[in-house]
Amino acid sequence: MTKLFLFLALACLVVAPMAEEIMLSRDAETGLTIVADNLRDRSNASLTLQCNIRSFFVEEVENEYGRFTKVEVPGWVSANKVGEADIPVLNKIVEVPFGGAVHAQVVSNDRAESACEEYGIYSAIYPAQESVRKDQVATFAYNEEAYKESYSRADIVTVEEIGIMRGARLVLLTVAPIQYNAADQMLTVNNNVEIELTVDDVDWTTTEINKEQYASSYFYAASESILTAESLKVTPRADANYLMIADPMFKSSAKLAEFVAWKKQLGFNVKLVYTDETGATNDTLLAYIKAQYKEFKPTFALLIGDHGQIPGWYKQFYTDLYYFTVDGTDYIPDIMYGRFSANNEAELIPQIEKTMAYEKRQFADPAYLNRFALVAGWDANWAKKRGYPQIRYAIREYFKAPEYVAAEHGVNVFLSAGSQQNVNTIFNLVNKGVGFYNYTAHGDKTMFYDPKFTNDTVDQLTNKNMYPVVLGNCCLTGSYQIDTCFGEKWLRAKDKGAVCFIGGSSYTYWDEDLWFGVGACTITSAINNGEAPAKAETGDGAYEAAVNGMYNNCNDAVIYAGNLAVQATNSSRKEYYWKVYHLFGDPSVKPAWAHK
């Protein structure tokens, strides 16, 4: 019987100074490309793809259980077989036409087997580790029995159905060209792998109808996260339909009427309904939204009311996700959504006023958009390993002079090296006005935990008409079932606070939060030492959507991009992440950036 031993987290790994690059081929770059698009061949609808590995990297590490070698392919991800040898694989979300089952097979490949020593591997390959929930202690997983086995029987290529995202059928293609014989310390590398991806009984009628009715630039047309063949690309329709569902108490709200008029002025086709028409239970609301998806085809939806008026779904914790998974039986949302969480008009009015002022660019000082607050909060084990790389990635890729003020540690960048550092400095910076405030570490229902920024802190702000987009990569800050969670506080605060808040309604995890921010990537030794991954080594993540204009650059796109990054890994928490992250605010708002 296989034994899986879990040990308490290691104090630290002794790491070699630098990973060694093992060159395999100088003729092609590492990655996956489409070489033939035959999806419109009704007798054999298929895509032919080519997977190449130019090189991989090896690095020996040591802990109290012995020496191990890490094997990494830049831009790839872990196979995530916890406790077993951590072999890198290539994952890619691929769009395919509607029809029957999807199959993947290897047509040809160059296979080379050698002793591990020939590849610079002189010890057992490091075991894959489970991602750690942010309120829990790390463990070290080592499956002793797995290291006594020869080659695993895993296929070189597999395909898994993801589901439908707004009319687009998505699958996850996994290519595992590196195979490891742990018992004999042998390695097989399959290079120049030609893959045929086929679709049974392809249904182009359904595919084209879905494209015509639902294709949206807000969702995937501009995203590099999804591999889309030319035969599936279309010009998106005008997708400005906006469904708003409110509690009946707001029928007499002049401010809500003003908000609807404003969104129409921006070009949205707004449909405002109340729960005395739609029903106010999970099931009746879902049935109504499903019907509207077919008839009205909203791109955006806004729930107007708190949990007591428009209840979330309880699935381990409260979530709004399942109101919007209306196409197919999967968990991918088909409508971009947010919530104006309000128990009364006094809580609703500030959210509307701040949204309209922001969209009208009625800024007290437009220079506030040049400022930002990027915070890797404190955790003795994880701040450096996950927080620093995420924040450093954001600085290097996006928050650069001359558009933004120079990034300076202790001024607008905070890489915590101890508990409760820079509390007052962060408050003063946010109070002065920042366009973006990102915190990653520990959170609670009413606060960023360390350095602390609480509901009471929000009350002390005076940042009128200098409202940021706030992203909290941490636990519990979006727990909207309580009276006033941290996310709700930022939106409900009058003449202060934020224009939108993105946060978790339950616990989040260290690895997944990193991927959410920077895109899917291998957790390398460099990352564990606090370095940011190279852009070429990641997919697209929340920063690409927020700052770089992906997904037509709207607030809810941040969540879509972040969760698609997690979707492209082998995390066991893909649905969990779609459930946990929530947007407090208007999902259609386009963030204002200094460089736009």
Question: Where are the language model's segments positioned?
Answer:
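Sec-dependent N-terminal signal peptides
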Residues: 4-13
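Sec/Tat signal peptide C-region and signal peptidase I cleavage site
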Residues: 15-19
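Cysteine-dependent hydrolase recognition
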Residues: 20-596
